[in-house]
């Protein structure tokens, strides 16, 4: 089938990224074995068999070649959901997003209207002494609240220690699950997570088991980590119809010199860079300096928007999940293979009962399927 590659007038409209999905296809729990989730493999659109659906994530091994570089995001999801008490005893919920200043942190609040400036909050736990918090302001961009924590809660390390005592894993609201909190503490975390700072999982990485990673390495495939602390920029719903000037909330990214040097070497050969998840894509593409026309190591906040019309510099292939309608992640994947083709593949995935979203199945976008770079 011939698909329109890029139409700026249509592809920059949010409505063009909507699709229908039966709620029964939203995964409430992951596959029992990580690498046995189903896998749709997307191939060159000119081929008669331009995609495969009878595969599993473990079959990614056969798709990759010796010398390829697989990039994983090693961020770790914090127990960033806090239940706090107002002065009248009413419970409200906070989602800790990021540090703002000193010991002040930006948090999403639910219900937000209850949290007025200068109000006191009480953080309780049966395992520790109560902690007093104060609302110091309202963030115009997110609608969140600036919350003043004790003075010693002034970096990610100290905040993560507090959250380990008082917090819960922030499972997305569309995951309807009767499982205990301890289940999600394991299943909503990649097996290689080691850098606390995320408030949502880099979900493509949930498909990678230790044995699959070991088999990749045995085949001569390099596996290297970057860090992108998944935050509001990844999961915030897009609230504007015109996408031509779309902006995303910043997220912390760290890509080492070692990874950058390997990418530079690969770009001089026929080897490929395969990203595990859209967060890895954003991190790697943020390494490209248009001023220097080269890749550079970074450790900073980034707000890169990838949408149709974007020309990829670093990434050649992608393992990803099936994403929410009208999401920034859907825009990113559309930039790789075209919006029309992606939505057609999603339609086929629904007919074949693939499972969607965070705990769902996976899609491998092969290098041959990419639009011309």
Curated annotation (Swiss-Prot):
Question: Where does the record place it?
Answer: Cytoplasm
Q: Which GO terms describe its cellular component?
A: cytoplasm
Q: In which pathway does it act?
A: tRNA modification; tRNA-queuosine biosynthesis
In this record, what's one Pfam family? Queuosine_synth
Which top EC class is named for this enzyme in its record?
transferase
Give GO terms for biological process: queuosine biosynthetic process; tRNA wobble guanine modification
The alphabetical list of record keywords is: Cytoplasm, Queuosine biosynthesis, S-adenosyl-L-methionine, Transferase
What is its quaternary makeup?
Monomer.
Tell me the protein's name.
S-adenosylmethionine:tRNA ribosyltransferase-isomerase
The organism of origin for this protein? Prochlorococcus marinus (strain MIT 9515)
């Amino acid at each position: 089938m011939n698909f329109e590659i890029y139409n700026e007038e249509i592809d920059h409209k949010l409505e063009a990224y909507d699709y229908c999905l039966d709620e029964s296809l939203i995964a409430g729990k992951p596959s029992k074995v990580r690498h046995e989730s189903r896998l749709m493999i997307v191939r060159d659109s000119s081929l008669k068999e331009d995609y495969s659906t009878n595969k599993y994530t473990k079959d990614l091994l056969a798709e990759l070649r010796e010398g390829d570089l697989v990039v994983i995001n090693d961020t770790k999801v914090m127990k960033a959901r806090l239940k706090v008490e107002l002065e009248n005893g009413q419970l409200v919920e906070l989602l800790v997003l990021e540090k703002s200043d000193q010991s002040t942190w930006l948090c999403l609040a639910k219900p937000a209207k209850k949290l007025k400036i200068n109000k006191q909050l009480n953080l309780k736990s049966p395992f520790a002494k109560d902690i007093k918090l104060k609302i110091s302001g309202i963030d115009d961009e997110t609608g969140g609240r600036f919350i003043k924590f004790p003075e010693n809660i002034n970096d990610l390390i100290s905040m993560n220690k507090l959250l380990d005592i008082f917090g819960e894993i922030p499972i997305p609201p569309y995951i309807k699950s009767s499982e205990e909190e301890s289940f999600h503490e394991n299943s909503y975390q990649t097996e290689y997570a080691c850098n606390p700072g995320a408030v949502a999982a880099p979900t493509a990485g949930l498909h990678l088991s230790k044995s699959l990673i070991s088999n990749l390495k045995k085949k001569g495939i390099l596996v290297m980590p970057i860090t992108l602390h998944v935050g509001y920029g990844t999961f915030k719903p897009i609230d504007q119809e015109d996408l031509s000037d779309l902006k995303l909330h910043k997220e912390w990214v760290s890509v080492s010199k070692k990874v950058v040097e390997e990418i530079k070497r690969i770009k001089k050969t026929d080897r490929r860079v395969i990203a595990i998840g859209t967060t890895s894509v954003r991190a790697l593409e943020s390494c490209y300096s248009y001023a220097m026309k080269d890749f550079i190591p970074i450790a900073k906040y980034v707000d890169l928007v990838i949408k149709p019309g974007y020309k990829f510099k670093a990434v050649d292939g992608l393992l990803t999940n099936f994403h929410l309608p009208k999401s920034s992640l859907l825009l990113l994947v559309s930039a790789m293979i075209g919006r029309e083709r992606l939505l057609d593949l999603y339609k086929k995935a629904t007919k074949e009962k693939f499972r969607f979203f965070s705990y769902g199945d996976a899609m491998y976008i092969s290098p041959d399927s990419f639009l011309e770079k």
